[in-house]
């Protein structure tokens, strides 16, 4: 069997996994899983110690999306009963930021449905972010869809720290998930974000009938894109979406996926994102031996577990919350 600790040491010296080594992680026998996670934790602990970054989503605009993404309950092809509303106002976004501050959330994520933001929607986000930075000093991540260079520049100027735009899957599998935009459209937005000086956040959704080679390709593509933060979502197959009833993930495989992303992107923030609770289930704590970041609270159209359960999990693991806000005028 592979010596996972030895491989971890090689990775930290700059070694990049070959495809066969990456696939071996996904094919790791269950009786070696803890050894695999030991290697992943060796990497994680060198770069992040025992700290965990907390993130919280504000669903700033829900539904009403013209795209045809097969996984999404907000898409034009979904029949799932989701709330639909236009962009929230500044005051509502500020109330969400205040809650995030009270919960020791390091990154407040403003997420809006749709192909891409209108200039008016960017205006609202810009206005809110300026005040969020002044009052709470939180890091802010925006996720508004495909982005124009001038919009990216405005977000950067307002104080947005990070922009999320997931590649979601591999380039070869992308047409099986959506045809209303291309994989290259997504990559172009990540590049636009980087050019504007924003920290790029880009991740994946696992469980959409992709192959193991697809997953390896995703991890490698994100390394090549140099994404600072990589959210790993596990499909929560919602009734009324084209992918409903297709999820065949199990908790052990999800842990192997998280380990793969750590071995292939050793220095990056790896976040256990959507679908954590329903796919990792009782093995959620083990995921943090590979990942160093989670979402707290609810997702866009699905519920997370009770916030208190997340904080108790971190306490039981002996991990510390990374929280260092820098408000400019103090919390009021």
From Swiss-Prot:
UniProt entry tagged with the keyword Transferase: yes
InterPro entries found in the cross-reference section: Aldolase_TIM (IPR013785), BATS_dom (IPR010722), Biotin_synth/BioAB (IPR002684), Biotin_synthase (IPR024177), Elp3/MiaA/NifB-like_rSAM (IPR006638), rSAM (IPR007197)
Superkingdom in the source lineage: Bacteria
Its EC number(s): 2.8.1.6
Pathway annotation: Cofactor biosynthesis; biotin biosynthesis; biotin from 7,8-diaminononanoate: step 2/2
One GO biological process term: biotin biosynthetic process
Necessary cofactors: [4Fe-4S] cluster; [2Fe-2S] cluster
SMART domains (UniProt xref): BATS, Elp3
Catalyzed reactions per annotation: (4R,5S)-dethiobiotin + (sulfur carrier)-SH + 2 reduced [2Fe-2S]-[ferredoxin] + 2 S-adenosyl-L-methionine = (sulfur carrier)-H + biotin + 2 5'-deoxyadenosine + 2 L-methionine + 2 oxidized [2Fe-2S]-[ferredoxin]
Family statement: Belongs to the radical SAM superfamily. Biotin synthase family.
Role: Catalyzes the conversion of dethiobiotin (DTB) to biotin by the insertion of a sulfur atom into dethiobiotin via a radical-based mechanism.
Protein name per UniProt: Biotin synthase
Organism: Geobacillus thermodenitrificans (strain NG80-2)
Classification of source organism: Bacteria, Bacillati, Bacillota, Bacilli, Bacillales
